Amino acid sequence: LRDKILGTNSHVVVTNVTQTGMVDYETIMEKVVKVEGVKAAAPFILNQVMLAYGDNAVGVVVRGVDADREAGVSDLEKNLVQGSLKMLERPDKSSGKPRRDGIILGKELARRLGVQLEDAVSMVAPASRMTPMGLIPKIKLFLVVGFFESGMFEYDSNLAFISIHSAQKFFAMKGVVSGIEIRVEDI
């Protein structure tokens, strides 16, 4: 159980006390990785959204991750049963479908939504934007590029991953992250 929890999550999470996000996160990460006992650090964005496919809609937690750095702080890559973290940034164009940003879903979440690889799911943000027609929720289509199975039902049924760049754009957090994940040598 301990390994499953620590495999899906990093050992330490650093966030801004005001919860407005971290602006100078690259500089902070440079300092953090120099601390003795720290193996790796990676930025992340965390938010709640609704994912919809067909007649199915589910409230989930979405994590924006840096595909190149995430493997150093969690076992997400090892828990993938299909796809790869790199697909979050560059989905396969060979299908002939329009290129969309990628999303990786927990196996149970995918089952609940009824999606398969290369299906497009709608992500709906909790915050709305004002238009001449009134308040409209922010919606974006993401291409399902992979599935993970952590062995923890709560994670596998309520968690999705997108690239940190997609998350920054979708949540209007340009140059900002929710925090930094850290993996240490000895817990």
Predicted regions and their residues:
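A structural signal for hydrophobic secondary-structure junctions
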Residues: 26-175
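Membrane-interface junction motifs in transport/secretion proteins
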Residues: 1-28
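A short beta-strand structural signal in non-transmembrane regions
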Residues: 12-16, 109-110, 176-187
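Short, intrinsically disordered, charge-balanced linker/junction segments flanking boundaries
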Residues: 1, 83-88, 185-187
